[in-house]
Amino acid sequence: MDTIASLFSFITIPVSWVIVQFHSVYGKVFGADTGWAWGLSIVSLVILIRICLIPLFVKQIKATRAMQTLQPEMKKIQERYKNDKQRQSEEMMKLYKESGTNPLSSCLPILAQSPFFFALYHVLNGIATGKTIGVIDDQLLASARKAHIFGAPLAAKFTDSADKVTQLGATLMDVRVVTAIMIVLMSASQFYTQRQLMTKNVDTTVKTPFMQQQKMLMYVFPVMFAIFGINFPVGVLVYWLTTNVWTMGQQMYVIRNNPTPGSKAQAAFLERLQKHVLHHGKTRSRGQRAVVKAIVAKGRDRNEFERKFINALTKAGLAAQSDGTIGKGEATAVAETEDGTQTTGGAPRRQQPKRQSKSQRQSGSAKAAGESEPKSTPLSLSKSDEPDDAKPAAKPAGGANKPSTGTRSKAQSGQRKGPQRPKSPSKK
């Protein structure tokens, strides 16, 4: 761990400078040598970093949802080219390019936090060994070594020896108890975040491998925290716990205000939006207008919850406009049936004729032919009443009963025209 932390030593000075600045503020309130001053400085560092990472978090949400949408297509490509890995990779890259999706975008917040995480570990490890690091001088080093949170030094670790912990002014039991409590809290917060994501913010209409991956991570992360947590100082665990709590709150906000389409969270969100629109007759904020605009733009591709929302507005005499606003009047209202067919202005849906089978079509054509036969009788009678001069000349006598020569005239119904092949004699 020390080797990995040394790779991010270039960011140690900025991280230590930020901690010292926050410590100078909290030290005036709680005292310079207290664990609250140093602990809150670490918490403030986390908050500052996470605020700066909000744009990356938004990009992560979009990338994650795009990957969820592409999972069925990715599975088809994997099955189609399962014996050709190179072609499979080419088709995957082509799919990402066409959809404008980058698989690494969902990892950006974690990758961006890693340098700060290991830089903080480098700073606290220097405090534990009594070395000045970054902008932390001897005076600040002595103050940080005296800082305890719930009886455990911020620079102490679960795996430290009893003598090393005693030099920091604490007992090994205190360090291990505080470390265990923090690991449990970290695991619980991460488990709750993943469970909320799995149960409320996943499209229930699509079963993808992504859901299985999320379910696996829900149980893997607590085990990882237990394994790696005992090797980190208490101050780093404070950083880690604060990050998990921030992520949990951020995820709850996203689930409530920007849920995944087709999820249970979207059903609850549209129900709240429907009550507000029916009560006030309009959308309240830019975010609500963006949601309504996206629903209108989907057309027949709307899911079940979105169709219910549009139909509820139509029944109330309201109409969702293409710009996300809500207007009145049935002329522009858009309603949808359960299969996604749109109807405008509450007009009844035209019934489509049922498709007939082949036997039904044949019986219908035979019946129509039978009804048309009596109609041809008057025509034949009228032809017989024509004058004699209008009739064609009769054939000469003797030629009426004379059969015509040629093989074509001898062909009867059921026979093949042309020279007939003699039958072979039967063998007895």
Swiss-Prot record:
<comment type="similarity">
    <text>Belongs to the OXA1/ALB3/YidC family. Type 1 subfamily.</text>
</comment>
<dbReference type="InterPro" id="IPR047196">
    <property type="entry name" value="YidC_ALB_C"/>
</dbReference>
<dbReference type="InterPro" id="IPR028055">
    <property type="entry name" value="YidC/Oxa/ALB_C"/>
</dbReference>
<feature type="compositionally biased region" description="Low complexity">
    <location>
        <begin position="359"/>
        <end position="369"/>
    </location>
</feature>
<feature type="transmembrane region" description="Helical">
    <location>
        <begin position="3"/>
        <end position="23"/>
    </location>
</feature>
<keyword id="KW-0653">Protein transport</keyword>
<feature type="compositionally biased region" description="Basic residues">
    <location>
        <begin position="418"/>
        <end position="428"/>
    </location>
</feature>
<keyword id="KW-1003">Cell membrane</keyword>
<keyword id="KW-1133">Transmembrane helix</keyword>
<feature type="transmembrane region" description="Helical">
    <location>
        <begin position="38"/>
        <end position="58"/>
    </location>
</feature>
<dbReference type="GO" id="GO:0032977">
    <property type="term" value="F:membrane insertase activity"/>
</dbReference>
<dbReference type="InterPro" id="IPR001708">
    <property type="entry name" value="YidC/ALB3/OXA1/COX18"/>
</dbReference>
<comment type="subunit">
    <text>Interacts with the Sec translocase complex via SecD. Specifically interacts with transmembrane segments of nascent integral membrane proteins during membrane integration.</text>
</comment>
<feature type="compositionally biased region" description="Polar residues">
    <location>
        <begin position="402"/>
        <end position="415"/>
    </location>
</feature>
<keyword id="KW-0812">Transmembrane</keyword>
<protein>
    <recommendedName>
        <fullName>Membrane protein insertase YidC</fullName>
    </recommendedName>
</protein>
<feature type="region of interest" description="Disordered">
    <location>
        <begin position="330"/>
        <end position="428"/>
    </location>
</feature>
<dbReference type="Pfam" id="PF02096">
    <property type="entry name" value="60KD_IMP"/>
</dbReference>
<keyword id="KW-0143">Chaperone</keyword>
<dbReference type="GO" id="GO:0015031">
    <property type="term" value="P:protein transport"/>
</dbReference>
<keyword id="KW-0813">Transport</keyword>
<dbReference type="GO" id="GO:0051205">
    <property type="term" value="P:protein insertion into membrane"/>
</dbReference>
<dbReference type="GO" id="GO:0005886">
    <property type="term" value="C:plasma membrane"/>
</dbReference>
<comment type="function">
    <text>Required for the insertion and/or proper folding and/or complex formation of integral membrane proteins into the membrane. Involved in integration of membrane proteins that insert both dependently and independently of the Sec translocase complex, as well as at least some lipoproteins. Aids folding of multispanning membrane proteins.</text>
</comment>
<feature type="transmembrane region" description="Helical">
    <location>
        <begin position="220"/>
        <end position="240"/>
    </location>
</feature>
<feature type="compositionally biased region" description="Basic and acidic residues">
    <location>
        <begin position="383"/>
        <end position="392"/>
    </location>
</feature>
<keyword id="KW-0472">Membrane</keyword>
